[in-house]
Curated annotation (Swiss-Prot):
Subcellular localization, as worded in the UniProt entry: Cytoplasm, Cytosol
Disulphides: none
Single Gene Ontology BP annotation: protein refolding
Upper taxonomic lineage: Eukaryota, Metazoa, Chordata, Craniata, Vertebrata
Highest taxon of the lineage: Eukaryota
One CC-aspect GO term: plasma membrane
UniProt name for this protein: Heat shock 70 kDa protein 14-A
Pfam families attached to this UniProt entry: HSP70
UniProt GO molecular function: ATP binding; ATP hydrolysis activity; ATP-dependent protein folding chaperone; heat shock protein binding; protein folding chaperone
Similarity section: Belongs to the heat shock protein 70 family.
Length: 509
């Protein structure tokens, strides 16, 4: 039985298969190795991938894009609100959760983000099964390093609903290193690897220390304001200006015409990664006018010059954050479809002239390839001289905190597991509660960076009941947190006086 790795990104999804000692991305039924993460609801059917993306011009209100941005979030979450404001499909609140409102004329229904992700996972499963000629269930799924517990849980539920058996969730930077076997060739050496990922809607830069075969995340930064879509939009705006210059018609306020230009610009952007020029032709763009325009790579680079600067600045900030110079970096790994852009690769190379830049695996395929290798390891298919399983040490992406009450009665948060903690990990903490109560509720929260902890950040709670009340003093509650490498969290609370105990497990899937 083959093992597979699946990467579900904001704009695209990809599946790789590990078989006969190697991992390869497999093409979908359209012959493409990368599938648009787009779902369209029609009167009689649901379509996923390129067909949904192409039909969006005529069916925008019932076509869902960038579902990963909203997956596992509450309706009130600022990230969800941003997604809702930018989406052509109506999103409503139901039980505190966002739901897509679908109305095809034949069907009116509410669809959750998990339902949409399930359809994309099902497409990936079908793609793998078609390539292998047999059923496939075991999978390793990639997640961004800054994905919270609720997001991972939602992603896992979607994959399970699609019929997958999740072997493990692996952070995207770790998958990228696995794809190139980094740490395998010199397991006792120490090196710094910078993982640069420019995806469809975000940019992430991660510094990983590889030491004695162990991956340790030194720092990571994610920027949601820059991604491949920004380059597409910039090119589409240029095409709109060219149309106005030629035909004296300003179409930038016409949503349908601009969506057509976005599709054409996206195709041209991809072509310009390998060609010196690309042709943008749109049939009946506006008022029956066919639009035909050629764009050179040099022109594209000029149009996007400010975007390139935005893509490079985060690298310099990360180096400063970890106290490294460019010469301290041993390798740079490129990930994400937009990391294919030659100008971007040149700018990164200028920053690291003496550093090995790894891009032999297509950047939009490297993460699922690494996930497939991890799946092969977990199924016992890997037979390398080095046990790669020893180097896939995951790290905690966010701080895990417990809410307590200080002496003045105000809430305070104590970090039990700080971000960057290598997994598996175990921590103990004594929580004190007033002796005159008979039950204690332990609440756990997660927080990324210096963000404020709010109720939106709570992901688990455990209640210890029927405690013997005390006339004076406090209850000492011993709390033990154990997080496994797969991200599952086991929480045990024990009253030190009575020995009464409760335990819960928070699974990643």
């Amino acid at each position: 039985m083959a093992a597979i790795g699946v990467h579900l990104g904001c704009t695209c999804a990809c599946v790789a298969v590990y078989k006969d000692g190697r991992a390869d991305v497999v093409a979908n039924d359209a012959g493409d190795r990368v599938t648009p993460a787009v779902v369209g609801f029609l009167e009689k059917e649901v379509i996923v991938g390129l067909a949904a993306k192409q039909s969006r011009v005529r069916n925008a209100a019932n076509t869902i894009v960038k579902v990963k941005q909203i997956l596992g979030r509450s309706y009130a979450d600022p990230h969800a609100q941003k997604h809702i404001s930018e989406n052509k499909c109506i999103v409503v609140e139901k039980g505190g959760k966002p739901k897509y409102e679908i109305d095809t004329g034949e069907i009116q229904k509410l669809v959750s983000s998990e339902d949409v992700a399930k359809l994309i996972f099902s497409k990936m499963k079908e793609t793998a099964q078609s390539a292998l000629g047999s059923d496939v269930n075991d999978v390793v799924i990639t997640v961004p390093f800054d994905f919270g517990e609720s997001q991972k849980k939602a992603l896992g539920e979607a994959a399970l609903a699609a019929g997958f058996n999740i072997l493990r969730m692996i952070h995207e930077p770790s998958a990228a290193l696995l794809a190139y076997g980094i740490g395998q060739e010199s397991p006792t050496g120490k090196s710094n690897v910078l993982v640069y990922k420019l995806g469809g809607t975000s940019l992430s830069v991660t510094m990983i220390e590889v030491n004695s075969g162990i991956y340790r995340v030194l720092a990571t930064s994610t920027y949601d304001g820059i991604g491949g879509v920004c380059f597409t939009e910039a090119l589409a705006q240029h095409l709109a200006s060219e149309f106005q210059r030629t035909y004296k018609q300003d179409i930038r306020g016409n949503a349908r015409a601009m969506m057509k230009l976005m599709n054409s610009a996206d195709v041209a952007k991809h072509a310009l990664s390998t060609l010196g020029s690309a042709n943008c032709f749109v049939d009946s763009l506006y008022d029956g006018i066919d639009f035909d325009c050629s764009v050179s790579r040099a022109r594209f680079e000029l149009i996007c010059s400010s975007l390139f600067n935005q893509c490079i600045d985060p690298i310099e900030k990360l180096l400063e954050q970890v106290g490294c110079k460019a010469t301290d970096v041993n390798q740079v790994v490129l990930c994400g479809g937009s990391a294919r852009i030659p100008k971007l690769q040149l700018l990164i190379k200028d920053l690291f002239p003496e550093v090995e830049m790894l891009s032999s695996i297509p950047p939009d395929e490297v993460i699922p390839v690494g996930a497939a290798i991890q799946a092969g390891i977990l199924l016992g298919k890997e037979n390398l001289s080095t046990d790669l399983d020893t180097i896939t040490i995951e790290c905690l992406a966010s701080d895990i905190l417990v809410k307590e009450t200080d002496e003045s009665g105000n809430n305070k948060f104590t970090v039990l597991l700080p971000s960057g903690t290598p997994l598996p990990a175990r921590r103990q903490h004594v929580l004190q509660a007033p002796g005159n109560i008979s039950s204690v509720c332990l609440e756990l929260y997660e927080s990324v960076g210096k963000s404020t902890v709010s109720e939106e950040c709570k992901f688990a709670q455990i209640v210890l009941k029927d405690l013997q009340k005390k006339a004076s003093g406090v209850h000492d509650i011993l709390t033990v947190l154990t997080m496994k490498r797969d991200g599952s969290l086991h929480i045990t609370c024990t009253d030190k006086d009575s020995g009464k105990s409760e335990m819960i497990t928070v699974e990643t899937s």
